[in-house]
């Protein structure tokens, strides 16, 4: 089962587990950087899951664009946010200078290292000049299927190399 299949199958329990998690402290530095660049920033919530972070972005005065690859998560996020959610995979993304910011909280953890390189190029392409990108990954050396989903962890050196490319 690939990660999208996993989230389609377990959308409701995953939603219930994550929808009320507070992300304010994690999001604060991103919000501060984004506020310096644009008052009404448009932010892509990449791998939006429940839509929780889209709602928080909008509380900060930004325009959140939720996106997820899982059809079932998109349905739940649409109900939660009362917004249309873009259902597409990273491969399907084709944005040019559209977003002031991209928020990818724990959504890139299911990509192989090669996929991550390709996605990073697409994310840079999607950002406007001086755009702000936030992404989080797991630190470690795990690479493979765990609990029904693929995970690739990173160490500092791997992340630096990825960012230099």
Task: Describe the function of each predicted region.
Residues 100:
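Conserved acidic residues
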Residues 103-104:
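A conserved beta-strand element that flanks and buttresses the S-adenosyl-L-methionine
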Residues 107:
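Hydrophobic adenine-recognition pocket in adenosine-nucleotide-binding enzymes
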Residues 1-97, 111-118, 122, 132-165:
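Class I (Rossmann-like) S-adenosyl-L-methionine-dependent methyltransferase catalytic domain
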């Amino acid at each position: 089962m690939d990660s999208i299949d996993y989230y389609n199958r377990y959308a409701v329990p995953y939603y219930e587990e994550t929808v009320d998690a507070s992300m304010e402290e994690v999001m604060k530095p991103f919000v501060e950087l984004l506020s310096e660049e644009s008052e009404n920033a448009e932010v892509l919530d990449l791998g939006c899951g429940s839509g929780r972070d889209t709602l928080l972005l909008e509380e900060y005065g930004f325009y959140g664009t939720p996106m997820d690859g899982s059809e079932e998560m998109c349905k739940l996020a649409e109900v939660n946010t009362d917004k249309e959610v873009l259902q597409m995979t990273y491969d399907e993304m084709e944005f040019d200078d559209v977003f002031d910011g991209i928020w990818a909280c724990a959504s890139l953890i299911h990509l192989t290292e090669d996929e991550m390189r390709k996605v990073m190029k697409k994310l840079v392409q999607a950002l406007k000049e001086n755009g702000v990108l936030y992404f989080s990954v797991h630190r470690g050396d795990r690479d493979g299927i765990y609990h029904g989903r693929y995970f690739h962890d990173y160490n500092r050196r791997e992340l630096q190399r990825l960012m230099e490319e």
